[in-house]
Amino acid sequence: MHRYKITFAYDGSNFAGFQIQPGERTVQQVLERAVNKIAKKPQPPLMVFGSGRTDAGVHALGQVAHFDLPYQIPGPSLVRALNSSLPLDVLVKEATEVAPDFHARFDAHHKRYRYRVVGGEFTNPFKRNYTGHYKYPVDVERMQTAAQDFVGEHDFTSFVASGSQATSNVRRIDEVTVVRDEENDEVVFDFVGNGFLYNQVRIMVAFLLEIGNGRRPVDDVMRVMKAKNRDLARGTAPASGLYLVEVTYDSPANSQND
């Protein structure tokens, strides 16, 4: 068997998330259908393993997955074959043969998530599936200052949703930026870390928006973090504004044939 790593994008609007769920349309489901089609429907069916799960409505610009094929195929040919079999809301960007022990999830080094927020009193119908809406004015400098308290290794118990299956809530965040995109009239949050908990990014965004609006003091992150109390963080930003931008690996070591 030959193992392949793919990088792909998807519009999460019409998916019930990444992971296969009975009776639901998911990203993993349509990927496995395409992979098994080009592999001539082997038995048992081939499985696709993603770098992580995204929830319903969450998008990806650079999600990563791996799977095995019973034959060797050049990367560009695999990209064409998969895209010919996938629905229009999924696009494979790159395919590479990798070492047989490569794992998209367990070998991931960092992930970058982006959250886009649009303002205004009412929701823009053309952005409603691709941004979060926050109708109150916000101070980007306040949010950028407060966001730096998320950087480092912390126990993020206050910023994880119920239903998390993680055995530890300790994670490391290496970078957080908050900028105003004047051209698109959006505020854009970027988070880079070694992994994120269930709804963690969306909870942190909602928290920072309250700081930006003056409903919380700028130094409130550490107070709530130390309390380890989810109720103190309050809201969760909508799924529609969240994007998995990229997943990084110590990759030339994992690559076989580029």
Curated annotation (Swiss-Prot):
Active site (record annotation): 55
Keywords from the named record: Isomerase, tRNA processing
Record keyword Isomerase present: yes
Record keyword Ribonucleoprotein present: no
Catalytic activity: uridine(38/39/40) in tRNA = pseudouridine(38/39/40) in tRNA
Domain of life, source organism: Bacteria
EC numbers, comma separated: 5.4.99.12
Example of a GO biological process term: tRNA pseudouridine synthesis
Protein's job: Formation of pseudouridine at positions 38, 39 and 40 in the anticodon stem and loop of transfer RNAs.
Alphabetized HAMAP family for the sequence: TruA
Membership in a protein family: Belongs to the tRNA pseudouridine synthase TruA family.
Protein name according to UniProt: tRNA pseudouridine synthase A
Record organism: Limosilactobacillus fermentum (strain NBRC 3956 / LMG 18251) (Lactobacillus fermentum)
This protein's encoding gene: truA
